[in-house]
Amino acid sequence: MHTQKSNFQTMKYFFYILMIAILGWFCFMQLFGANEQNYNNPSKSIIYSGSFYWNKEDGTKQKIDIPGTYEVKPGHTMVLTTTLPKDYDETSFAIRSSLQDIQFYVGNSLRTQYSTKDTRMAGKNSASRYIFCPTTYKDAGKTLRIELTTYTSNYSGIVNEVYCGNKAEIWQNIYNTYGISTFIAFFILFTGITSILFGIALKHVYHTTFDMGYFFDMEYFGWCMVMGSVWMLGESKIRQILVPNASALAALCFVMIMLSPLPILFYADNIQNGKHQKLYQNIGYVVILNFIVSSILYLTKVKDYIETLPVAQLLLVFVFILIFIHLMQYIRKINK
């Protein structure tokens, strides 16, 4: 019996070593192996290489570099034009909107337009996303015009990279560039939800709220992870293919930043046994008040979340610094 148990234990160790070796091999191949994605990549660049001109309101033209940022007043339309080459035969143009309404014209014909004015429930601007304009070889030699309009100074005058090629190839390039961060966000979201459920289950099983004598509370840590992952998904460049309503996810991104100090305060209060509870409670009231005021301004279309975001960022930084100081004091005290 002892020999059988020893052999089974040896098998377990072999399994652990084997799995670590397989994981190591996989990581080695990804870091140092051949990049097989290149075999499917287009042979030519999908970045549009033609010249763009900014047609200003005073009638003058200025050749501009793309991507770039230029001085345009909020609410004013920035008009960009380029002449398609004589041998043009691509099927799509694309540009990323940064909280901008976008219109594509080929010749004098409106080919594509994007605006959430009639579909969004609140806010002043359209959510950022990639806009595709279909083209054909018949458009060779014609003038392509792009009109950009935003109603906030944060993104007024911003011109993002312009892509030209097959729509699938453009999406592949975008996915290869930004896909990994989206996968990481989903992983953190799954881990955060698991932590919340695990923390709630522990409280239910042991009939305690973990308020005394516990250094780690799974639930609040899970909420921090969930809110962080939702922020990452809201910032994802490919969010328009993740959800049907990208505007809601974009707004949720800012909401998470505004409310994220709360679970951090709850966690810090728990591990310090309520030592600074009154202070944390007052800070929590300020966080909630900022959320309510910002939401009212957003719903009434007075200011977008992006315009009130600096206040939330300052609160978050203040909470981080305060909690860090208190935790250092707490750790120093318990180590004495």
Language-model segments: which ranges?
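Surface-exposed coil/turn segments at beta-strand junctions on protein surfaces, enriched
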Residues: 73, 86-88, 124-126, 137-139
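Extended carbohydrate-recognition surfaces in non-catalytic/accessory domains of CAZymes
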Residues: 3-86
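Solvent-exposed beta-strand/loop surfaces of large extracellular or lumenal domains
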Residues: 60-67, 110-129
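Juxtamembrane segments at transmembrane-helix boundaries
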Residues: 182-336
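An acidic-aromatic loop/edge-strand motif
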Residues: 126-185
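Aromatic-lined ligand-binding clefts that engage carbohydrates, nucleic acids, or primary amines
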Residues: 86-106, 144-146
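Extended low-complexity, serine/threonine- and proline-enriched intrinsically disordered segments
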Residues: 43-56, 100-110, 162
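Intrinsic-disorder/low-complexity, polar/charged segments enriched in Ser/Thr/Lys/Arg/Asp/Glu/Gln
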Residues: 75-83, 90-92, 130-132, 141-143
